[in-house]
């Protein structure tokens, strides 16, 4: 799955590739954030966080400046699309910056595989992550894209399965399910995108009319800068029952990310752009 993929890539970069510094952001998925913190605590790596603006946009000039400030071997870990506010990162530009500064680049592409056209022959990320359930494949299965020249090694040993990157008997039915779901989604990508983008545009229009002072978080209203599957809003009132009330009307919303379900603390992503 995406979580295991992100863990493996980041930990192996530190343990096997000699990475001494990780540049990331407070917008990352919890599995990336906590893995980076663990590597700082256990391995003593330097951890640098880019500060997003109030729209959740990262300053790539600042990234370049930080990369040029040290000769430490560096991994940049920045997600392609944020799972809470939907902001898209220009991973082609980040790849270019990383290559120019001899840094490794990992992108959590869990939200965008099968939803956007990705070509890793052209977009020169070193590592990327995918999870099948994001395109209606089976839960608990995903993949890690690893550039052959990277030298990355697996963390689970004892067998040569999965190109020596993950020992153990393969989850064949999960892998086949992932492949079939990916095939179906990519074949119908344009149709699916147009349909869901239409629903998102309608929701933005109707919410704006119905709720004065509603706030759309990140770049939610800009289809060029936001993933079509995600719409994040801040309401100008408090209603702890709103999730239940909308569910009774047949409308599903999320009041937090799945990785933080049940948590009483506010979203780290929203805190980083709203405070």
Task: Describe these PLM feature segments.
Residues 1-275:
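Pyridoxal 5′-phosphate
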């Amino acid at each position: 799955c995406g979580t295991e993929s992100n863990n493996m890539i980041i930990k192996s970069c530190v343990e096997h590739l000699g990475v001494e510094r990780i540049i990331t952001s407070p917008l990352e998925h919890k599995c990336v954030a906590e893995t980076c913190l663990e590597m700082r605590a256990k391995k003593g790596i330097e951890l640098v966080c880019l500060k997003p603006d109030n729209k959740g946009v990262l300053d790539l000039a600042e990234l370049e400046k930080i990369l040029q400030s040290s000769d430490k071997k560096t991994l940049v870990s920045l997600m392609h699309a944020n799972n809470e506010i939907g902001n898209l990162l220009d991973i082609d530009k980040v790849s270019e910056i990383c290559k120019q500064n001899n840094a490794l680049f990992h992108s959590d592409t869990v939200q965008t595989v099968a939803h956007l056209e990705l070509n890793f022959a052209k977009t020169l990320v070193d590592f990327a992550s995918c999870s099948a359930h994001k395109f209606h494949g089976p839960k608990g299965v995903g993949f890690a894209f690893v550039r052959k020249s990277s030298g990355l090694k697996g963390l689970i040993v004892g067998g040569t399965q999965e190109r020596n990157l993950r020992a153990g008997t393969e989850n064949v039915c999960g892998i086949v399910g992932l492949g079939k779901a990916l095939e179906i989604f990519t074949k119908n990508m344009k149709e699916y995108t147009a349909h869901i983008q239409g629903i998102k545009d309608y929701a933005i229009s109707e919410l704006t009319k119905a709720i004065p002072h509603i706030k759309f978080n990140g770049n939610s209203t800009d289809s060029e800068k936001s993933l079509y599957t995600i719409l994040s809003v801040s309401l100008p009132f408090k209603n702890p029952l709103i999730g239940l009330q909308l569910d009774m009307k047949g409308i599903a919303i999320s009041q937090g990310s799945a990785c933080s379900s049940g948590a009483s603390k506010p979203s780290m992503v929203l805190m980083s752009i709203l405070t």
